[in-house]
């Protein structure tokens, strides 16, 4: 998938800075080529839970942000993230005291 198309699918208006940021995240994400499609699928599946995949501004990772308005929707979003991680062998890092995960990459 082209970087412009990926940024648009994630809800960004592509520009040079975002393309460079996405490129740095791709290089930092272990086995990125194996999980790219699954990251985009997860983004689509999480929308109904007020959750999404985004570019982290503080680290070169994709982040999964859960902003669900109810505990039930939040729980469902966390379950989807867990399923994604287990099914596609994706290593995640949950941020302490936040509804956020970093996608570290493919874990063999």
PLM-predicted stretches and their roles:
Residues 1-108:
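Structured alpha/beta or helical-core interaction and ligand-binding surfaces enriched in interleaved
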